[in-house]
Every structure is written in structure tokens, then in C-alpha cells.
Amino acid sequence: MSKFKKYLGAAWDFTKEHGVTILRGVAVLLVGRKVGRVANQSADVLDTVIKGTKKN
């Protein structure tokens, strides 16, 4: 049982030190994907608008 507690303690210390960084990284990945998708869509729309105005 003491080995388990020791492991748990080490895991908790690691989480306290690096948990925020890990969570932030995951959030950035998730948000980044969404933002990236939106940015791509915006770029496509802008591209279409620019091409449309050039034709006229």
C-alpha cells in the first residue's frame, strides 16, 4: 500500500507542477484546430470575394 501511496504522491506532485502546462497544451490544440478551421474558412471566403471583385 505504501508503494501505491508513494506513486500517487509522485503523480500528484507531477500533476501540480506540469498539469496546468499539459491542460494549456491540450486547450491550445483543441482551440487551435477550431481557430485554424475558422481561419481557413475566412481565407477561402476572402479569396472568393477577391476573385469575384477582380472579375468585375
UniProtKB/Swiss-Prot annotation:
The keyword Membrane applies. Coiled coil: none annotated. GO terms for biological process: killing of cells of another organism. It is found in: Host cell outer membrane; Host cell inner membrane. It comes from the Viruses. The keyword 4Fe-4S does not apply. Keywords: Antimicrobial, Cytolysis, Host cell inner membrane, Host cell lysis by virus, Host cell membrane, Host cell outer membrane, Host membrane, Membrane, Viral release from host cell. One of its GO terms (cellular component) is host cell plasma membrane. Disrupts the host outer membranes during host lysis. This is Disruptin gp28. It comes from Escherichia phage phiKT.
